[in-house]
């Protein structure tokens, strides 16, 4: 899990340094999704260990992860993170996770 976490966190750092309009952002998002979607349980454990700032940046890919996982477990993870960090505005991500389970 350490390599995995380090990879994702280093991508988050890269993402933080980019200008909001930088086209490279999409590539970073795709890489993060590719790593996290491999194993839902690992992804959930990883997200639960993240701090608020990293989660803020990772929340940009929550919709993509929701459509990959389409699961109650991932939705529950988002709900717990929202409770833990009420300042993170995750309502849309949670809505999307619910919708993706219904599709």
Question: Model features per residue range: what roles?
Answer:
Residues 26-36, 59-69, 91-103:
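Structural detector for internal amphipathic alpha-helices that build alpha-solenoid repeat scaffolds
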Residues 1-11, 37-49, 71-82:
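Amphipathic alpha-helical scaffolding segments comprising HEAT/armadillo-like alpha-solenoid repeats
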Residues 15-18, 48-54, 68, 83-88:
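Solenoid-like repeat scaffolds
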Residues 20, 34-37, 52, 70:
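Residues in soluble alpha-helical coiled-coils and helical-bundle/repeat scaffolds
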